[in-house]
Amino acid sequence: MKKILILLIRFYQKFISPMFPAKCRFYPTCSQYTLEAIKEHGTIKGTYLAIRRILKCHPFHEGGYDPVPKRKNKNSEGKREE
């Protein structure tokens, strides 16, 4: 599923996005953010992060630099290392 989503995003970036004027208010662009989020966090969480990001893309949000959050270590979530 992850590879299919990545292919769809790449298709969008290469063939669909160039047909419209660039007007993304964020860096990286929403499609690049989605690609990075899926690669970093997997299909489910990456898609969730992408949806959250796209919902922020409106005229009342200032935009700017908004990187994909780094993946947390499993041990940093309160789990003991044995």
Curated annotation (Swiss-Prot):
Topology in the membrane? Peripheral membrane protein
Which keywords has UniProt assigned to this entry? Cell inner membrane, Cell membrane, Membrane
Q: Which Pfam families match?
A: YidD (PF01809)
SMART domains recorded for this chain? Haemolytic (SM01234)
Q: What's a single GO CC term here?
A: plasma membrane
Q: Where is this region: Disordered?
A: 61-82
Signal peptide position in this chain?
A: none
Question: According to its UniProt record, where is this protein located?
Answer: Cell inner membrane
- Function, as annotated: Could be involved in insertion of integral membrane proteins into the membrane.
Q: Which NCBIfam families match?
A: membrane protein insertion efficiency factor YidD
Q: Which family does it belong to?
A: Belongs to the UPF0161 family.
Q: What is this protein called?
A: Putative membrane protein insertion efficiency factor
Tell me what organism the protein belongs to: Fusobacterium nucleatum subsp. nucleatum (strain ATCC 25586 / DSM 15643 / BCRC 10681 / CIP 101130 / JCM 8532 / KCTC 2640 / LMG 13131 / VPI 4355)
